[in-house]
């Protein structure tokens, strides 16, 4: 990790993973609803394996600019395949469990994902030190075989509950947006705005860690682990209160937005390392709660026939917004500094979140309409 790393290069790497959702998530959702979530899920997991394998091959076979291009291409392909995987997995959950368990089951994925983020950096660092980059990336690629085997051989979904869309104009993403209703439209809009303003820490984590902790590789691991620990905490809170939180969607989303905004403002005036790590914990909790809440609310509040497309719209809101956020904040960092970027984003996010809470906090989500 080098403090002189170009913020735009860091943001571009995350954008390569996140921005494909703006283009791919819509078609991914449409395909999931048309051909079936299990089929798309397996296909996307094989694609993830191939894309990650491409990155593993880049290290021993290429060097210089060719290696950089191949690694960025691998990241881009992982982002594309991941958009299909996440879309299909969300709808797949609804045929694995019943309606009463769906909310808790969906939010459990956030917890599991963030546990992976907590233990992943130290495991990845150990693999890198013990085996080198080629084997480390190769093992990472091979890890995709486990979920493939789970879906193909171990999980037993009730496929009779899945409702597929038919070909035609009513099966598109635009139709899902119109039919989901004003509450879910508002949920997607608020999530997109908050992510566009403040979801930049995944891409700029190396730069933030350098400013807060220092330039040692272990400092980045510590920073990302604290973020992940906060994300786990936010996910657990949402999981244990999924019914109550989803009933008041704008109060929930706005509340998580306020937590993130206050933490970002704290980062802009951090008096020390301990305080900065505490703020990083809150940023992890707030953003995880926001993203998981959006996913939860749009799934349980929509009909089974459009849940693939709603998952696609959710991805566009938070990953598309996040990919753009990193690039915008990188421009602020280059023109001023990181503290200014935190202050600006935290202030805007706080105003946006409080305004939505003030105007729509009483809005409620209709009960689950289908299994």
Task: Report residues per predicted region.
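Flexible cytoplasmic inter-helical loops of multi-pass small-molecule transporters
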Residues: 152-175, 365-370
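C-terminal transmembrane helical hairpin of 12-TM major facilitator-type secondary transporters
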Residues: 249-294
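Helix-loop junctions at membrane interfaces in 12-TM secondary transporters
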Residues: 57-74, 266-279
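Small-residue hotspots at the loop-to-helix junctions and early N-terminal turns
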Residues: 4-11, 107, 217-224, 312
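Substrate-agnostic recognition of the 12-TM MFS/MFS-like secondary transporter fold
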Residues: 14-32, 37-48, 70-129, 194-202, ...
């Amino acid at each position: 990790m080098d403090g002189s790393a170009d913020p735009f290069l860091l943001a571009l790497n995350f954008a390569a993973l996140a921005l494909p959702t703006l283009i791919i998530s819509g078609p991914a959702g449409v395909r999931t609803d048309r051909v079936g979530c299990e089929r798309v899920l397996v296909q996307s997991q094989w694609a993830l394996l191939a894309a990650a394998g491409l990155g593993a091959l880049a290290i021993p076979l290429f060097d210089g600019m060719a290696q950089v291009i191949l690694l960025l291409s691998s990241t881009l392909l992982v982002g594309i395949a991941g958009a299909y995987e996440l879309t299909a997995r969300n709808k797949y959950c609804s045929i694995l469990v019943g309606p009463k368990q769906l909310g808790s089951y969906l939010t459990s994925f956030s917890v599991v994902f963030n546990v992976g983020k907590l233990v992943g950096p130290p495991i990845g660092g150990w693999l890198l030190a013990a085996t080198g980059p080629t084997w480390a990336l190769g093992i990472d690629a091979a890890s995709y075989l486990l979920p493939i085997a789970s879906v193909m051989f171990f999980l037993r979904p009730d496929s009779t509950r899945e409702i597929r869309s038919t070909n035609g104009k009513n099966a598109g993403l635009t139709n899902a947006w119109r039919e989901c209703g004003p509450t879910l439209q508002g949920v997607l809009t608020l999530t997109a705005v908050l992510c566009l303003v403040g979801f930049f820490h995944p891409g700029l984590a190396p730069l933030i860690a350098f400013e807060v902790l220092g330039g040692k590789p272990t400092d980045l691991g510590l920073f990302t682990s604290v973020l992940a620990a906060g994300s786990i905490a936010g996910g657990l809170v949402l999981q244990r209160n999924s019914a109550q939180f989803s009933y008041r969607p704008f109060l929930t989303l706005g509340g998580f937005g306020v937590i993130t905004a206050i933490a970002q403002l704290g980062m802009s005036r951090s008096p020390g390392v301990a305080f900065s790590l505490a703020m990083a914990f809150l940023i992890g909790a707030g953003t995880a709660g926001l993203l998981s809440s959006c996913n939860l609310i749009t799934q349980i509040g929509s009909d089974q026939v459009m849940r693939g497309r709603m998952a696609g719209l959710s991805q566009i809101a938070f990953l598309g917004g996040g990919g753009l956020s990193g690039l915008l904040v990188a421009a602020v960092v280059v023109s001023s500094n990181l503290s200014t970027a935190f202050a600006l984003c935290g202030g805007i996010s706080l105003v946006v979140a409080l305004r939505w809470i003030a105007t729509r906090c009483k809005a409620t989500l209709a009960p689950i309409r289908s299994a």
